[in-house]
């Protein structure tokens, strides 16, 4: 799971209302299928920017979202350390879809870009 709200709020306070994890935590949570020194990891870490805190901690009324008639898909990353497969299955069920499984960590665009493209092209 993601770090607690206290840590997020602390990071946000230090970042003027935005959160950016230390690089080691970014790698440990989202890029576990690639070695730390891999150029894809170092390149991705160099491009990360702080993210606003509000979407992470404020509740959102999802009624309008569920009322929209738009196609939905959920790609479940089976090696994800941030959103474990069981939790991802819950998220997919909430969307009313069967997840499409991909054997990678949280960032398939880094570790499995070709497999991700094949999935997206079928949508």
Residue ranges and their predicted role:
Residues 17-47:
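Pocket-forming structural segment of enzyme catalytic cores
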Residues 46-65:
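Active-site nucleophile elbow and catalytic-triad environment of alpha/beta-hydrolase enzymes
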Residues 67-69, 94:
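Short, well-ordered coil/turn elements that cap or connect secondary structure elements
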Residues 68, 74-76:
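Short beta-strand/loop motif that positions the catalytic acidic residue
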Residues 77-110, 123:
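Conserved loop-alpha-helix segment in the C-terminal half of the alpha/beta-hydrolase fold
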Residues 113-121:
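Short, amphipathic alpha-helical "lid/cap" segments that border enzyme active or binding sites
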